[in-house]
């Protein structure tokens, strides 16, 4: 045995790069496509935007995915584990404005730096599959797919009110507006009318909803619920309201409450609804136009939000209630949006809270048409009644239960040709036009004769110009002097018209960057950056896509539930219909990892705003329980407040640089810390003591293994049955099998690496060199090394090699356990007589029933404890306890 002074020092800075170089040279993490699918496994983490530096959220996400990939390789799977870059997007243009860097240069310099960081972490990626979405090859293939979508009728252009980010000067999808503000910048979003390119995601609404049932059990319930809510399927009726004095105009409403039709006292309409131009009288024109301008200053999401003030404007027009024939006023309302539903809403103040508040505000009548069972008709006065009840004041439907009346009134409307039963969706088509430079150009042209026409596939790709001026004001491509009218070869852009070639102009909008992330996972299956054709010249190779998809495990944040994840599901179905794949769902299992959180450090400014500090700017003292006793700024020695634990963010400066941790402790320590504290789906709270604890554990494993290496190298690891062992050897032999089972169960069921790591720590505590035989000690150490392999691969590989194994851990495989060797052959029984423990005995586990009772009563210690007293009743729980009444 080596003395502590002779043990090789644990030096991650030397060990880790050496193993990374060996893995890379051996191509250990590349994959073949000729392995049967049942022995293949595709694990993918959501690829990053190349912002320039990894943060701790990245480290946790990728550590989870990499540990799964390494575990599955050890289980004999061919694992596809790729990495790429979601590299189009606004920050590159912001860098051009702030730093004078070209977006392409800035992006690819960041990619190079972050690739190096990922490699230094030892993540086992198939780097031959790497691509960036801004690579010409990927962008060209995406344009190819886009034209296929055009041909299938899934792309169209329309002029409509859009969400306009005042901070980004571009259009946002509905999903990118949060509380009336831009999801990225937090700046206000207003309504603006622009021509937009859209994808018909609504064509797949029904399949997107039904497909969620297939994902049950593989996806988090919270994500499934968010998608169901976003799709928003509603069954109800469309009802036609004639406009008084305008026999050629009909306003159609959608409602899920046709039973309340007789109680309609006004109708609300979107201020931007096209019909208003025809039906608003001159007396109300100025008032309506002013209201329309006011409403345009807010986003659709803000207008429809529960907390927004509900405002209205009388239009001077009236509509006819098709059930009663009564004229009711038409109000323009800020909470009604033209492209949501029909843009017209019937209002029943007696039975809808929002309508009641609106009616109270504007002095509109309230007519009750549903009464609680047992109550008659009458003015309630205390508010709206929204529960089921009995129809009243509704003509032929009086006395009918309101739920039954829904169908009856709908049928009456259909027979009267005044309405119809319909299904509607909250989901809207996906507007993909963005007025930015750093995105994939939309491959369309405009010419006098042809009008709007798709670019021919043989003329792809439409490439971005390098000589572009970016100032944050408007669309850089639209302002470029020549790009829109110049062909790829530098000649004037021409298209083939009916009478011959004619001049054309390119579309200057680029695609929403969610386009790129909607199919990248499929491209990884057939991409190879070592080949001239990049793996395949077509956008996708169907055979290889179908071999690998769906992704077996997809790891990423829950914040993408109704953005990226919904778009990716839609895109996969569309790709299937285009013949690129036979797969309809992209991700079999989804793991939404928790955030990395940290306490905030700040001072309150005189203006009430918080001034945040980075952790290394503050001296914090804690007591034995980790509670803060003092916090002062290093710069001035003045107190700093310690705030609540929140997600790490640059804005609150509660961040830690992963690179600094790697330099100080090594990649394995970082990986172990983010995996060890809690299950992967829960938030992990950053703790420097926790990181130090992870490092201490790795050093302890290192010292144990290296310290016993000389003693154990010539001794085979024990591989027999534990029944052949005695004492501490037998106990540890059973512990080895129990630990393997515990780790295997944890990783197979929930990828609970925290449970597996805890089990490894327990096993390490049992490996006492002074108490164990060399064979059992070696078996314990080597089992520990193999179990830690997926989580801390560098240390594990180094120690595995140190014990004389020429093959690596992947070839060695995951250790197996024998359930029969986990429990001892004999069970220990405390024997209670009259409720007090009088003896402790051991008996074979095979004994049950009368044989077990007979063995208990015949045991010498029990006989002595009974002292001749007869047993009136014996209660024996096999393997647990004995209770005797005398």
Feature roles, as predicted:
Residues 2-44, 73-82, 105-116, 217, ...:
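Conserved oxyanion/phosphate-binding beta-strand-loop segments in alpha/beta enzyme cores
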Residues 4, 9, 17-18, 22-26, ...:
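Residue patterns forming the tRNA-binding/recognition surfaces of aminoacyl-tRNA synthetases
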Residues 6-10, 233-238, 371-374, 379-411, ...:
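Long, charged, mostly alpha-helical binding arms that flank functional sites
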Residues 8-20, 68, 139-371, 471-492, ...:
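NTP-handling and nucleic-acid-processing catalytic cores
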Residues 32-101, 130-145, 255-256, 322-358, ...:
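N-terminal catalytic cores of NTP/NDP-binding nucleotidyl/phosphoryl-transfer enzymes
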Residues 86, 147, 151-165, 421-450, ...:
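Helix-rich, typically C-terminal accessory recognition domains appended to large enzymatic cores
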Residues 183, 441-505, 599-647:
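Glycine-rich (often Gly-Gly/Gly-Pro-rich) flexible segments and glycine-rich loop motifs
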Residues 251-273, 430, 436-443, 509-524, ...:
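Conserved phosphate/anionic-ligand binding catalytic regions in large, soluble enzymes, centered on
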